Amino acid sequence: MPGPRSTLTALVAAFVLAVTAAPAAAAEEEGRDAAGDVRSRGVSVDTVPRHPEPQRRTGDIVRYGATYDAALVVTTKFRDLAARGHQEFTWFLRTSQDEFEWYVALIVPPGKNRGTFTLIDPDANQLDCGRAVLDCAARTVTLRIPASCLRDPAWVRVAHGARVYAGGREFSDDARRDTVKAAGWTYGPQLGQ
């Protein structure tokens, strides 16, 4: 029969393990976004896009996946990626090392299949160590940023979505919600190394 000292030692050890254990972080995330959940507003209206646009296919996210190990890779699949309207694909990143967000964007002008890539760290430095690729045939946009570019954080959380501007309207879709928030996109879980 264990003595009081060994029982106390076991309890203290269990407590220390429970308190110091790191939260579980997945190395990858996959998900679906409802088709037909695009929301719109007039471009001169200063409110959240609320008008449902179930027939709007361009910029409508249907699936996404993200992995993080040697690089952060986020692939987003759309119902349609035809070169219609001004298209903005944006990502916000939170990392284990930074107090503020990273901002990432691929801006594609009307009628084009390529755009301008922007990566800005939390200190407002514009970096050139990542890329985003638009593949209209596959209906995907893929973001890739090496972990070293992100300063090798233990984990990364990703929020992303798309906006298309056409005909005097803004059409928005958040990858993880059936609606659109007032600011930014909805974050996914921690992706850990």
Question: Across the structure, where does each feature detected by a protein language model lie?
Answer:
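Order/disorder boundary and secretion-linked terminal/linker segments
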Residues: 2-6, 23-86, 98-123, 168-193
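Bacterial N-terminal signal peptides
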Residues: 10-20
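Beta-strand acidic-aromatic groove motif in beta-rich domains, primarily in extracellular
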Residues: 84-93, 157
